[in-house]
């Protein structure tokens, strides 16, 4: 079965981070990133890209994968009707590996263009 991927229509080069999210895990990518991806389709909302900050040693593998993929990934939503939708997500504009560069996170917190800071929701 061939999967159709619905791609975003905005130019990522024009998107500016307005949200800093600390802890870029699965829940964040399936929810906050998805809805932000939809918002960025509106040309008047191009200042709401996401900067992700990853802090834990266990996050390094995902950080490296996302960097290699230019911070893009796909998300499949399994419909109750049995029809799935796969989206290309491009709302993650910037990614900081806090273990290598903790000062970059502090600088991003102080960035005047960051309007919202959201923390990781689920921890062990």
PLM-predicted stretches and their roles:
Residues 123-124:
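Conserved small/polar residues in nucleotide/adenosyl-binding loops
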Residues 115:
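Conserved acidic residues
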Residues 107-111:
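Short, charge-rich binding segments
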Residues 2-101, 105:
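An N-terminal structural lobe/cap that precedes and organizes the functional/catalytic core
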Residues 54, 118-120:
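Short beta-strand segments
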